[in-house]
């Protein structure tokens, strides 16, 4: 039996060029597909991660309120809140304390609006008036529903039990970007009469799962229910309930210096869908710095094991501002001093707040107190705009209660 010899015949010319052409064409298509994917990835990266562009620059600042009976015979303006509505209107709020600078006493809620990205502001409107009660309203937190466009504003009544017995959590809302407001709604039938001091600052609406679309407003209590906890709504603000919170230690008892006592707080959502709550460290437990809580179930629960402290965020026991941009930049503002309310400073993080950039922006070296942050991003009047950050804060030359000022900051440092 003889074996077959290897063929020495030339390849069939009818098939060779076609086969080579086929594979050559495949290579072209493969390279084209790779190029397209890389281009898309680059575009996505540019859209999703703008960290290399960040050079915050203050482009404008103006006083919105001045204390000392210069506006509507109001003694003191305090507790600034600022938000950008889904339509791009800026709303700035403050407590207008009628007779004194005290946290107690009668007040208005003052509002100014801007429809041109903070260049001009409407005259002051007083949208809530508590009369002449001895322990009046206290702001507060503001949150918008991006699906309905409704803006919700929360405040408390009788939070200090000074000349009154029953506390209430109150709610007003606007469907026209703050032009008009509802009559106040008392939430006591839904959530009870335990003291809940919302904010001060902004609530959030979850943009990611879990519980995408949920409205979250966080705050703190007093001795009857101390610590930090949040109000939640899954029906666009029609009903509200509490999630569980993190209590102070010792619970329900007066606190001493260095006891654990989380207080005024500001939530924001991270890209993984978790919620961070940056809180005032009322009794300087562990450090003269901020308490950081984190929830992985849209604030249904806050667990002690998810409580940390941020030594980089030195703090003199104050309400601070915090906000995150759509690309994941976390901004934080406070008087950056371990003891005194001075040196209002803006910081930012590219790592979800686990570390902070060495660069900072000092907004005011002198007396400065509470602050609130808001961003405007995306298209404005049909044109794509670079992101803008707004800081509404208490500012003075001798004392931080002298005025409330708004600073506009270009995130990319462009004019």
Curated annotation (Swiss-Prot):
Motif (Internalization signal): 412-415
Mutation effect (residue 240 to R): In SIALIDOSIS; type 2; no enzyme activity; retained in the endoplasmic reticulum / Golgi or rapidly degraded in the lysosomes
Originating organism: Homo sapiens
Phenotypic consequence of residue 217 to A: Significant decrease in sialidase activity; absence of lysosomal localization; mislocalization to the endoplasmic reticulum
Phenotype when changing residue 341 to G: In SIALIDOSIS; type 2; affects substrate binding or catalysis
Result of changing residue 234 to N: Significant decrease in sialidase activity; absence of lysosomal localization; mislocalization to the endoplasmic reticulum
Entry protein name: Sialidase-1
Effect the entry attributes to changing residue 219 to A: In SIALIDOSIS; type 1; unable to reach the lysosomes
GO biological process, one term: ganglioside catabolic process
UniProt motif FRIP motif: location: 77-80
GO CC entries: cell junction; cytoplasm; extracellular exosome; extracellular region; intracellular membrane-bounded organelle; lysosomal lumen; lysosomal membrane; lysosome
BNR repeats: 112-123, 172-183, 231-242, 347-358
Gene name of the encoded protein: NEU1
Reported impact of residue 243 to R: In SIALIDOSIS; type 1; no enzyme activity and no transport to the lysosome
PTMs per UniProt: N-glycosylated. Phosphorylation of tyrosine within the internalization signal results in inhibition of sialidase internalization and blockage on the plasma membrane.
């Amino acid at each position: 039996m003889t074996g077959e010899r290897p063929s020495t015949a030339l390849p069939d010319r009818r098939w060779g060029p076609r086969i080579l052409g086929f594979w050559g064409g495949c290579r072209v298509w493969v390279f084209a597909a790779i190029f397209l994917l890389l281009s898309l990835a680059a575009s996505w990266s540019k859209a999703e991660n703008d960290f290399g562009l960040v050079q915050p620059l203050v482009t404008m600042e103006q006083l919105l309120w001045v204390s000392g009976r210069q506006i509507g015979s109001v003694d003191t303006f305090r507790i600034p809140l600022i938000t950008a509505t889904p339509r791009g209107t800026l709303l700035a709020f403050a407590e207008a304390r009628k007779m004194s600078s005290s946290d107690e006493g009668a007040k208005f809620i003052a509002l100014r609006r801007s429809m041109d990205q903070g260049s001009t502001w409407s005259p002051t409107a007083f949208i809530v008036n508590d009369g002449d009660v001895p322990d009046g309203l206290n702001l507060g937190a503001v949150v918008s529903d991006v699906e309905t466009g409704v803006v919700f504003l929360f405040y408390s009544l009788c939070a200090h039990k000074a000349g009154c017995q029953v506390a209430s959590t109150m709610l007003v809302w606007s469907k026209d970007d703050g032009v008009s407001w509802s009559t106040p709604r008392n939430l006591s039938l839904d959530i009870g009469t335990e003291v809940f001091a919302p904010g001060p600052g902004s609530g959030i609406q979850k943009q990611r799962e879990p519980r995408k679309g949920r409205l979250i407003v966080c705050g703190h209590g007093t001795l009857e229910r101390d610590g930090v906890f949040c109000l939640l709504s899954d029906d666009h603000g029609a009903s509200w309930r509490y999630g569980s919170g993190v209590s102070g230690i010792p619970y329900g008892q007066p606190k001493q210096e260095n006891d654990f006592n989380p207080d005024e707080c500001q939530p924001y959502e991270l890209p993984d869908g978790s919620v961070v709550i940056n809180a005032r460290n009322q009794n300087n437990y562990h450090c003269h710095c901020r308490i950081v809580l984190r929830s992985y179930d849209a604030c249904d629960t806050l667990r002690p094991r998810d409580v940390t402290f941020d030594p980089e965020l030195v703090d003199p026991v104050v309400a601070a501002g915090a906000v995150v941009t759509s690309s994941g930049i976390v901004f934080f503002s406070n008087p950056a001093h371990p003891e005194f309310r001075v040196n209002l400073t803006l910081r930012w993080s590219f790592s979800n707040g686990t570390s902070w950039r060495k660069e900072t922006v000092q907004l005011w070296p002198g007396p400065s107190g509470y602050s609130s942050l808001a961003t405007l991003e995306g298209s404005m009047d049909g044109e794509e705009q670079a992101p803008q950050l707004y800081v509404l804060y208490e500012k003075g030359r001798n004392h931080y209660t002298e005025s409330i000022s708004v600073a506009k900051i270009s995130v990319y440092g462009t004019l």
